[in-house]
């Protein structure tokens, strides 16, 4: 089952495995106007969440640790991910979105990804 990503060693292998998982999952996930896709992008320092309507190709709402309300905030990266989850849920609800499809982007559902998802659920998004 090759997905066009070469296998390497060490950290490069982890990145390639994440890319393979993301490609595999994206074949089955798509956002619609009724249930857009909540995409989570994670780096070593920041986390970004976007609510995307794939049919129209538009981003309906977004939040990240680079937002001014979160950027200087206290706490570790998981606490900041919770703030991002609550903020993206608030902005999505303001845009008229009640339910989303969660796209973890090939990342494991643990740590910052899970913290963001739990905070978005608590703020009222359904997925």
From Swiss-Prot:
This is one of the proteins that bind and probably mediate the attachment of the 5S RNA into the large ribosomal subunit, where it forms part of the central protuberance. The keyword Zinc does not apply. Part of the 50S ribosomal subunit; part of the 5S rRNA/L5/L18/L25 subcomplex. Contacts the 5S and 23S rRNAs. PANTHER family: 39S RIBOSOMAL PROTEIN L18, MITOCHONDRIAL, LARGE RIBOSOMAL SUBUNIT PROTEIN UL18M. Pfam families: Ribosomal_L18p. GO terms for cellular component: cytosolic large ribosomal subunit. This is Large ribosomal subunit protein uL18. One of its GO terms (biological process) is translation.
């Amino acid at each position: 089952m090759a997905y066009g990503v070469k296998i390497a060693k060490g950290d490069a292998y982890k990145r390639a495995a994440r890319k393979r998982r993301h490609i595999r999952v994206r074949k089955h996930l798509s956002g619609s106007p009724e249930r857009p896709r909540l995409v989570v992008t994670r780096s070593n320092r920041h986390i970004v969440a976007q609510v995307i309507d794939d049919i129209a190709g538009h981003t309906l709402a977004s939040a990240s640790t680079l937002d001014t309300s979160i950027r200087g905030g206290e706490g570790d990266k998981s606490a900041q991910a919770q703030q991002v989850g609550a903020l993206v849920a608030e902005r999505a609800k303001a845009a008229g979105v009640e339910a989303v499809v969660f796209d973890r982007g090939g990342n494991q559902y643990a740590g910052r990804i899970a913290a963001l998802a739990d905070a978005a659920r608590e703020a009222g998004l359904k997925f």
